[in-house]
A protein has these predicted regions:
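Conserved ABC transporter NBD signature motif
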Residues: 48-56
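The feature captures the beta-strand-to-loop junction immediately N-terminal to the Walker
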Residues: 25-27
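Conserved ABC ATPase signature
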Residues: 125-129, 133-135
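Short coil-to-helix segment of the ABC ATPase nucleotide-binding domain corresponding to the Q-loop/switch region
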Residues: 85-92
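Helix-to-loop junction immediately C-terminal to a conserved catalytic motif
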Residues: 40
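Catalytic Walker B motif of ABC-type/P-loop ATPase nucleotide-binding domains
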Residues: 150-153
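A short, proline-enriched helix->beta-strand linker immediately N-terminal to the Walker B motif
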Residues: 144-148
């Protein structure tokens, strides 16, 4: 992948174990967002391989990408909610696309909203929610399909310390039930006390892989 005529990522090699939780850090423009987009198939690499469950997903045909994305939940800093749809409708979108039945959609959307503490806001529009609540809607949408992997791109970037801590605890809860979690963040204070691996990107190169203190 290229940014401004140069490679956004160069020689990046790492392995994330199934069921692992890890953090991805680096300065603005280091390549964090690009790496997450490559993993979930939003962007394609110009060279190299990306293996998911033993399969090279960088060579998937366009029609195969949706099947990959059903196994990966993606959370964005600006959460990409549809402001003219209810909270319930926003969370239901991945299930509707996947062709789930009405009963299955109702059950799983309710479970996802309950998990993030927003079941009572299901009929609200996103504009009626706080920034932290909107981010939790984005998280519910990402996990409603029960993905094997959860990717989060600066999910606490616009939130205060208390809300950020709550979001991180949510990710830890998902991880405890077996979901693999990779969270990109520049908030080193938030993650420094967590016992998870920290992968650091700088100028498109990866460093570290150490465990937080």
């Amino acid at each position: 992948a290229y940014l401004g005529g140069r490679q956004a990522l160069q020689g990046v090699t790492f392995h994330l174990q199934a069921g692992e939780m890890a953090f991805l850090t680096g300065h603005s423009g280091a390549g964090k967002s690009t790496l997450l987009k490559l993993i979930c198939g939003i962007e394609r690499p110009s060279a190299g391989k990306i293996l998911f469950g033993g399969h090279d997903i960088s060579r998937l045909k366009s029609r195969e990408v949706p099947f990959l994305r059903r196994q990966i939940g993606m959370i964005f800093q600006d959460h990409h909610l549809l402001m003219d749809r209810t909270v319930y409708d926003n969370v239901a979108i991945p299930l509707i696309i996947a062709g789930a039945s009405g009963d299955d959609i109702r059950r799983r959307v309710s479970a996802a909203l309950d998990k993030v503490g927003l079941l009572d806001k299901a009929k609200n529009l996103p504009i009626q929610l706080s920034g932290g609540e909107q981010q939790r809607v984005g998280i519910a949408r990402a996990v409603v399909n029960k993905p094997a992997v959860l990717l989060a791109d600066e999910p606490t970037g616009n939130l205060d310390e208390a809300l950020s801590e709550g979001i991180l605890r949510l990710f830890e809860e998902f991880n405890r039930v077996g979901v693999t979690v990779l969270m990109a963040t520049h908030d080193l204070g938030l993650i420094s006390s967590r016992p998870y691996r920290v992968l650091s990107l700088s100028e498109g190169h990866m460093h570290g892989g150490h465990i937080g203190e």
